[in-house]
């Protein structure tokens, strides 16, 4: 099987980006080990602190964030990082050429039940005229991403990665410690009969989403004339991995509870990297009003609605917004 380095070189990734990705993934391998230790290492459960999002931090949130912050700060390739667990950007090397945004442990509420979790990341070029601690450096649309991916910590540790030449899947070979290519240029099926949404929020959805999901649930007796199954992992990384692997539509739409907060998922380190992977695999990614990758960020922890997955199904969903 082909190793990660070989595939990155084939895809034309510059050497410095390859070295940065290797550094980042070394941190992810350390996180994978910590996750696998679980209760044996005393890393389960919550801390007494909250992150900038107002969310109670799990112990593994804090550990994972520190691992990535340390390894990226020391690499020399990174000018600054932005993380879900950090209030502000973290300055690294003033001469670094890249910015890295990440969610160190997506789905961390699943740690205590031994369910799917993962690390999500995106990389952009660092504007050389900006200071390393200037958050405006990160306010670039997703179209500027040079690499994005996630590592899923499941029965095996799997990496989904794109540098703009397709989305590839790799599996961590724990015997030799490297990621091996296991699926090249994955293509998301254009059609699907699966959808992923947190149905407990149904009463808060806007009419287009209410109507669309209602038609899916109606199944073969409704206007879609076929049955759909709902899947929900409660970790974006797990749901997106399923969609990439076998198709589907994933939704975390705007709801009416807080008009000042247009979505649940963060643009820089959740929505953008997943949208990049999905488009590179032939899928679509939208806010309901436009392409996710074209959203111009206004702050590093900005949230957006998310609809992404199988091309034809996302197009069908978006047609409800135009009705």
From Swiss-Prot:
Binds 2 magnesium ions per subunit. InterPro entries: FBPase_C_dom (IPR044015), FBPase_class-1 (IPR000146), FBPase_N (IPR033391), FBPtase (IPR028343), Fructose_bisphosphatase_AS (IPR020548). Pathway: Carbohydrate biosynthesis; gluconeogenesis. Disulfide bonds: none annotated. One of its GO terms (biological process) is sucrose biosynthetic process. Mg(2+) 2 binds at residues 103, 106, 270. Belongs to the FBPase class 1 family. This is Fructose-1,6-bisphosphatase class 1. The lineage of its organism: Bacteria, Pseudomonadati, Pseudomonadota, Gammaproteobacteria, Alteromonadales. The gene is fbp.
């Amino acid at each position: 099987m082909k190793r990660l380095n070989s595939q990155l070189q084939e895809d034309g990734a510059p050497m410095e980006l390859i070295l940065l990705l290797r550094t980042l993934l070394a941190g992810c391998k350390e996180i994978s080990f910590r996750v696998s230790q679980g209760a044996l290492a005393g890393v389960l459960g919550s801390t007494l602190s909250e992150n900038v999002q107002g969310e109670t931090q799990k112990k593994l949130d804090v550990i994972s964030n520190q691992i990535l912050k340390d390894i990226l700060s020391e690499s020399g390739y990174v000018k600054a990082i932005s993380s879900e667990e950090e209030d502000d950007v973290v300055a690294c090397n003033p001469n670094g050429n890249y910015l890295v945004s990440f969610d160190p442990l997506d789905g961390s509420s699943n740690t205590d039940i031994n369910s799917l979790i993962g690390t999500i990341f995106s990389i952009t070029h660092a504007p050389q005229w900006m200071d390393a601690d200037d958050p405006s450096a990160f306010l670039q649309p997703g179209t500027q991403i040079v690499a994005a991916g996630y590592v899923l910590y499941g029965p095996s540790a799997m990496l989904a990665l794109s540098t703009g030449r397709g989305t590839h899947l790799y599996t961590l070979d724990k015997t030799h410690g490297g990621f091996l290519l296991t699926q090249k240029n994955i293509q998301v099926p254009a059609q699907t009969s699966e959808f992923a949404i947190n149905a407990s929020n149904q009463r808060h959805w806007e009419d287009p989403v209410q109507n669309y999901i209602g038609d899916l649930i109606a199944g073969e007796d409704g206007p879609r004339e076929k049955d759909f199954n709902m899947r929900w992992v409660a970790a974006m990384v797990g749901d997106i991995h399923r969609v990439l692997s076998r198709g589907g539509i994933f939704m975390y739409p705007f709801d009416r509870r807080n008009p000042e907060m247009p979505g649940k998922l963060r643009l820089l380190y959740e929505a953008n990297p997943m949208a990049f992977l999905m488009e590179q695999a032939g899928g679509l990614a939208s806010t309901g009003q436009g392409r996710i990758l074209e959203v111009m960020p206004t702050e590093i922890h900005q949230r957006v609605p998310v609809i992404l997955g199988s091309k034809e199904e996302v197009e069908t969903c978006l047609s409800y917004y135009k009705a």
